[in-house]
């Protein structure tokens, strides 16, 4: 079977963000899986238009999500919610999300971004995605990712391994199903 194409989306675009460091940590873990082909979409670099107009950035995003077999959203939590740039990304394309699994890597202070993930699960359900049960939560992100080498706790490491297995299972199954019987939604 061909490797799964997995897109990791960095959802925060703020100055001083920790999202890229967290995403790079997850990508390092994910690329250890030989059945995955992992790419990163950094929303800070892509600059999707907020008015959802067609643009070269939107077309690039549409193609990459269309080719993906699974998605991982790396999200911070701002004021008990997820970043606006991430919502713009989800709203910028439509059919490309359908019948694909998604996992979440969240980070923040004491809550670790769990409230952002709770809200995102509702959004992706409306997009006809399958949210895997396991997520990765990075509590006190500046303590764990503030300097190299990163001191990520064992709970997050274990969660990442479980989430990768779940995404692998769903990604392979849904890819075969989409190929044999296109999603009717």
Locate the predicted segments by residue.
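N-terminal beta1-alpha1-beta2 submodule of the flavodoxin-like/Rossmannoid cofactor-binding fold
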Residues: 1-93, 147, 151-185
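A short secondary-structure junction motif
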Residues: 96, 144-145
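His-Asp phosphorelay/catalytic-motif detector in bacterial-type signaling
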Residues: 98-100
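A glycine- and small-aliphatic-rich helix-loop capping segment at beta-alpha/alpha-beta transitions
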Residues: 88-95, 122-127
């Amino acid at each position: 079977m061909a490797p799964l194409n997995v897109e990791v989306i960095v959802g925060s675009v703020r100055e001083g963000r920790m999202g890229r460091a967290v995403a790079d940590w997850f990508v390092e873990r994910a690329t250890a899986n030989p059945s995955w082909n992992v790419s990163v979409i950094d929303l800070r670099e892509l600059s999707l238009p907020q008015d959802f107009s067609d643009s070269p950035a939107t077309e690039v995003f549409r193609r990459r999500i269309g080719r993906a077999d699974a998605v991982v959203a790396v999200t911070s939590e701002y004021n008990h919610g997820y970043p606006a740039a991430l919502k713009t990304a989800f709203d910028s394309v439509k059919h490309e999300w359908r019948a694909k699994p998604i996992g979440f890597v969240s980070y923040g202070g004491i809550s670790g971004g769990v409230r952002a993930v709770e809200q995102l699960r509702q959004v992706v359900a409306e997009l006809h995605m399958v949210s895997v049960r396991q997520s990765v939560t990075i509590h006190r992100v500046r303590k764990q990712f503030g300097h190299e080498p990163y001191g990520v706790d064992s709970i997050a490491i274990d969660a990442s391994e479980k989430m990768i297995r779940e995404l692998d299972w769903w990604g392979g199954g849904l890819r075969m199903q989409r190929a044999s019987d296109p999603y009717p939604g």
